[in-house]
Amino acid sequence: MGDVRDRPVRDRWGMTDQPFRFSSRSSRRALALLGGCALLGAVSTPAAAQSPGHGRWVGTWAAGVTAVPDRAPGYPDGRIAYVEDQTVRQVVHTSVGGDALTLRLSNEHGDEALRLGAVHVAARAGAGGTDIDPATDRTVTFGGNRAVTLAAGTRIVSDPVALDVAPDADLVISLYLPGRTEVSTVHQYALQVNAVADGDVTGARTVTPVAAPEQWMFLSGVSVRARTRTSAVVALGDSLSDGVTTTAGANHRWPDLLSDRLRAGRSPDLGVANVGIAGNRLLHDPNPPAGQPVEAYAAYFGPSALHRFERDVLGQPGAEHVIVLLGANDLGQPGSSAPVAETVTAGQLIQGHRRLIARAHARGLKIYGGTVTPLKGAQFGFWSEEIEAKRQAVNRWIRTSGAYDAVIDFDAAVRDPAQPLRLRPDYDGGDHIHLNDAGAQAMAMAVPLRLLR
């Protein structure tokens, strides 16, 4: 049976994560521009339920969840503030297959209990939309019950669901919320059009959307019971891992493309859990200057990687490897979307990396350091000669210290050979910091597959 207990969200030091609350919100584009590169958070249910049967439970899909900024007049950006007597239908993409699955649901940032009247999962029908294949539709239970209530600040893992799950495929997860429910726990950049429909239509082949949010709501992971002995690699990062300027609906984030490489090579059964969060920092939680527009969306940046490492990395079922790509937001946000007082030194960033390494090694995980990619020309004050000197110092330490189990030189993979402080123009997503699909492919190709075998 699945672990169905509501679990308080506590970090390594026993502190309960509190919901971030800010005064207003802004557009997806503004958040993307400030997203930089980062990811990770608090403690999650350690492993999917080990039900009777063969194989091992491993994460096939994941998302780092965050709080939602307070809604304020003047920011009609399409976010769904509340749902009531409605079904939220969401599409996720698998990395590895299996013969059963569990869902991880989250009310970590909610101020009130989250009541789910019904939950269904099915294979997606067709290449677009949220239609399901009725032959694959399954009711999801929690301790044998179809309805479940999550207390504020908790998360839950479902009972195992018997369903043949294919790798590199889309699942549709439908949540029915009978009462008025604030949408409080999300992943902002789904890069996937989901659906909200009236009534309990969790088992319907097709729904009629009243809204089409591009977020994942109350959903943080899917695990499968793999048919073979396998494991998972976790991508811990910021907006570069979150793929904010890659093609929506195409699954072209670099961790997605790494999963494609693994399936085509000698590691077809390795799960990839992408817990990148746009705007995430290694050292600091969101802390926008009061009265600034960034208050509208900074909550989406998520708890610092140090604070969410337990939840998002060590808590991933089957995790044996972690790739870290963080630091750009620590360098670039102070003075724009974070207080000047949070300006960091290269030494402080290095100490943060050492803490991640120690925690991974204490749990037997291999951890690989990704170099910080070029920032020159980036918007919102992300580059100066001082910031560049710090970036070079951190990258030099990552490359030469031997502290990480291996180095993945993302910087070398995407920089312009003619102007190495800048991104290659053909990899530039348009703002001189984020990457397009070709740039994401270059990052995926920079990962030596031998590390993950």
Where do the PLM segments sit?
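Catalytic His-Asp segment of secreted/periplasmic serine-dependent ester chemistry enzymes
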Residues: 281, 289-293, 302, 332, ...
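N-terminal export leaders
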Residues: 27-33
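Active-site-proximal beta-strand/loop segments in catalytic clefts of secreted hydrolases
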Residues: 106, 176, 236-239, 274-280, ...
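N-terminal secretory targeting modules
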Residues: 11-15, 19, 33-236, 242-250, ...
